[in-house]
From Swiss-Prot:
Gene3D superfamilies: P-loop containing nucleotide triphosphate hydrolases. It is found in: Endoplasmic reticulum membrane. The keyword NAD does not apply. It is a multi-pass membrane protein. It is an enzyme of class 3 (hydrolase). This is Protein SEY1. The lineage of its organism: Eukaryota, Fungi, Dikarya, Ascomycota, Saccharomycotina. GO terms for cellular component: endoplasmic reticulum membrane. Residues 1-692, 738-790 are cytoplasmic. The keyword GTP-binding applies. GO terms for molecular function: GTP binding; GTPase activity.
Length: 790
């Protein structure tokens, strides 16, 4: 809705004419006379008065309003036409029938402005004239003709008429709008055209106390309410006022008391027409050349005048409408009282069959009351208002209907959702179809019991239910799809972990080729439609997510199994395998330093040869392992993992680098420290073994202890023990265990010596130290006694 307000005034009824070149003026032509005869010479008049071929370049403007309100004066001042105007000394009807005139120029703030388009103006006989009295037939038909053939309909109204019903011609407009809807409504539905008519409300004699915006709001509200109350055909009930009309406003001051302001308001209205061109829109035009419009106007008048389907309401029908409306209102109020009594509370678990029967009884009671009072009036009106009552009752019952239907749907949807979760992805798509079909059938059956045999539509309920089902299924599909992805990633992670652990047993140049081959074996098998009924896009997204997570798992598992600590332990184990044990897996005994140094170098080399293999994932062809996705990209991690650590963005990552150079140096330093300690320990044991007792000492012992040896030989007990000891030594020598046995014996002896020294130190300790300890013990005992006494 548009507004335009001048600084304006109080009733303009006298003729006022802006001087214009009289040679440009053309006499108006009466296209419909007061006896309802149509003038077929319109086209000749237009061709004669127009300066050039009109074609489609024209606009039709008409004026509508009460008699003697200055309609003709407004047109003459604005469009520089020469319609007859009322003699101010004698208020009586001036315009009879409908007149048409060509506008040579339009009055604007720039002066007389020539329009780019040809403007044809129709002056329509005023309404509510004393000459016609109660005969409103012509004024209704004339108003309908103007509305049907014009692009812009000027409704000329005094400020004091705004808010009135009869004074503002609302009753007449209602009748005209009803017939207009019947005439053009079906055409609009069939052709889907966007044709409209602009209602230009010119508020005359505007004092300025009430703002134009307020007047416009009141008048627009009256139009909307009037449209809502129209008796529309069933197929046209959904059409709105805005589908047929646009509304804009313009206010004019009093022509006599404020002539200057009145003229300025006229000029501003002219600006809106031809300067800014805001009032002429393509959808207002009938989109036919001028000769087609004249033919259309003639056919339109014939249909309005003669077609019985468009007969305007008679007084009898008007009375019937009024009385039937009263009866409908009374019956509906009685229905509402019963409605409130029965449906004060909503039953959580109703019997739908009983509820449907109650609906039918309430409605039938209302129909019987209506029929008893309204059936004596005009049958068409009676039936029409009965339909209105039916619609009112159905609309009210629909409230309870919707509540129970919604509760039923919610209950069944909860069960449906639990059933979906219980499927755990097994035959998901098939079971979803079965469950959803059963759910819709259950709702359809239960709700139809209270639908008044289909009068209360199930379409919205079923549509909403279907959307809810789709939403629940879509949600569960995502859950199941994520579950499949996560389970597959776990399976891949377990397989990858086993593969890496196996390769760590004996790493070599083909280690990462084997790991990658095992990874790709599981990685590339993932795919398909998953049997969830998901779209190809969702399936592809799931595959992408699986692959991204798989590479993340590759990275995480390798770093978990090959950490600094585990790498150090692995190097030590490989070193010990060569340094402490021989090829047969038996403990190795070193008898000289040369053998120790040689074995130490071999063991150390054996351990360190896997360090470059395990710290950087490189294939046999020299290339590093590169993932299909940049798993360190924050956007990808957000997309596939749902979040990421901002601190990771500050670090430079290399997928193939398992141990950094700094960590590698730390591991190498710790490894060297550990193996060097083992080397020194082993070397010390060799030195101890070599420096024990010289061999010649054994010869001296043999010479000096000959008698003792002989005594042992001659003694059966000692001789037997010697035989057993000798046999044991021989067996150990034969089995190759003599050296290990000697080492064990030597270490046992060393431990015995250490323990003996400790005991001897305790025995030989100074007496004063012993005495001191005893005194300390006594003092402690005394304190304990005192504390106990306390």
């Amino acid at each position: 809705m548009e507004l335009s307000e001048g600084e304006l005034s109080h009733t303009s009824s006298s003729s006022s004419f802006v001087p214009v070149d009289q040679r440009q003026l053309q006499d108006a032509i009466q296209i419909i006379d007061e006896n309802k005869h149509f003038n077929t010479g319109i086209l000749d008049y237009i061709n004669k008065t127009s300066p050039a071929d009109v074609g489609n370049n024209y606009h039709i403007i008409s004026v509508f309003g009460s008699q003697s309100t200055g309609k003709s004066t407004l047109l003459n001042r604005l469009f520089n036409t020469n319609f007859d105007v009322m003699d101010e000394s004698n208020r009586q009807q001036t315009t009879k029938g409908i007149w048409l005139a060509y506008s040579p120029v339009v009055s604007t703030t720039l002066g007389h402005t020539t329009s780019k388009s040809n403007i044809l103006v129709m002056d329509v006989e005023g309404t509510d004239g004393r000459e016609r009295g109660e005969d409103q037939d012509f004024e209704r038909k004339a108003a309908l003709f103007a509305l049907s053939t014009s692009e812009v309909l000027i409704i000329n109204i005094w400020e004091t008429q705004v808010g009135l019903y009869q004074g503002a011609n609302m009753g007449l407009l209602k009748t005209v709008f009803e017939v207009n809807l019947s005439l053009f409504g079906k055409s609009k539905l069939e052709t889907h055209n966007d044709h409209k008519v602009l209602l230009l409300i010119v508020i005359r004699d505007h004092v300025g106390v009430t703002p134009v915006e307020s007047l416009a709001k009141t008048f627009t509200s009256d139009l909307q309410n009037m449209w809502s109350s129209l008796a529309k055909p069933a197929e046209l009930e959904h059409l709105q006022f805005a589908d047929f009309f646009d509304v804009t406003f313009h206010a004019l001051n009093h022509k006599v008391l404020q002539p200057k302001e009145f003229g300025e308001g006229i000029n501003r209205l002219g600006d809106r027409l031809v300067v800014s061109n805001e009032l002429f829109k393509p959808e207002y035009h009938h989109d036919v050349p001028i000769d087609g419009w004249t033919m259309y106007a003639e056919r339109c008048w014939e249909q309005i005048e003669t077609n019985k389907d468009l007969d305007l309401p008679t007084q009898q029908i008007l009375v019937a409408q009024f009385k039937c409306d009263e009866i409908v209102e009374s019956v509906f109020q009685e229905f509402l009282a019963k409605y409130q009594h029965h449906f004060k509370e909503v039953d959580a678990a109703p019997d739908f069959e009983e509820l449907g029967a109650l609906f039918a009884d309430l409605r039938q009671d209302a129909f019987e009351d209506y029929d008893a009072s309204a059936s004596r009036y005009n049958k068409a009106v009676y039936e029409q208002k009965r339909k209105k009552l039916r619609w009112l009752i159905n609309d009210k019952l629909k409230e309870v209907f919707d509540v129970h239907a919604k509760n039923l749907c919610n209950t069944l949807l909860e069960k449906f959702e639990k059933d979906l979760v219980a499927l755990k992805g097994k035959d998901f798509a098939v079971n979803v179809k079965t469950l959803s079909t059963k759910l819709v059938e259950d709702v359809n059956f239960q709700v139809s019991l209270m639908s008044l045999q289909g009068d209360l539509s199930l379409d919205e309920i079923i549509l909403a239910l279907t959307k809810d089902i789709d939403a629940i299924v879509a949600k569960q599909q995502v859950i199941e799809l994520n579950s499949i992805v996560n389970k597959s990633v776990k399976k891949l992670s377990a397989s990858l972990s086993k593969s890496i652990q196996f390769e760590l047993g004996d790493p070599n140049e083909e280690t990462w080729d084997n790991v990658l081959q095992q990874f790709k074996g599981v990685y590339e098998k993932f795919g398909g439609d998953f049997g969830l009924g998901t779209s190809s896009t969702q399936n592809q997204q799931a595959i992408e997510k699986f692959k991204f997570k798989s590479w993340c798992q590759f990275y995480d598992v390798t770093h978990k199994l090959i950490s600094r600590e585990k790498l150090l332990a692995l190097l030590q184990d490989r070193f010990d395998d060569k340094f402490r044990y021989d090829e047969n897996g038996l403990p190795k005994l070193y008898l000289n330093e040369q053998d120790l140094e040689k074995t130490f170098a071999v063991a150390k080399q054996h351990a360190l040869q896997v360090l470059p293999i395990l710290t950087f994932a490189k294939l046999t062809d020299g290339s590093e392992i590169v993932p299909d996705y940049d798993i360190f990209d924050s956007k990808l991690r957000e997309q596939f993992l749902g979040g990421y650590d901002d601190s990771d963005d500050e670090e430079d990552h290399c997928f193939a680098e398992i141990i950094t150079e700094q960590e590698k140096s730390e591991v190498l330093a710790k490894f060297k420290k550990e193996v060097d300690a083992k080397y020194i320990e082993t070397k010390r044991s060799i030195v101890q073994h070599i420096t024990q007792i010289p061999y010649y000492i054994y010869l001296i012992i043999l010479v000096l202890g000959w008698n003792e040896f002989m005594a042992i030989i001659r003694n059966p007990l000692f001789f037997s023990l010697s035989i057993v000891l000798g046999a044991t030594v021989y067996v150990l020598y034969y089995l190759g265990l003599l050296r290990p046995a000697l080492v064990v014996a030597q270490r046992t002896m060393d431990e015995v010596i250490v323990m003996a020294k400790t005991k001897l130190r305790e025995v030989l300790i100074d007496d004063h130290e012993v005495t001191g300890r005893q005194l300390n013990k006594m003092a402690g005992s005394k304190e304990n006694i005192e504390l106990d006494d306390m």
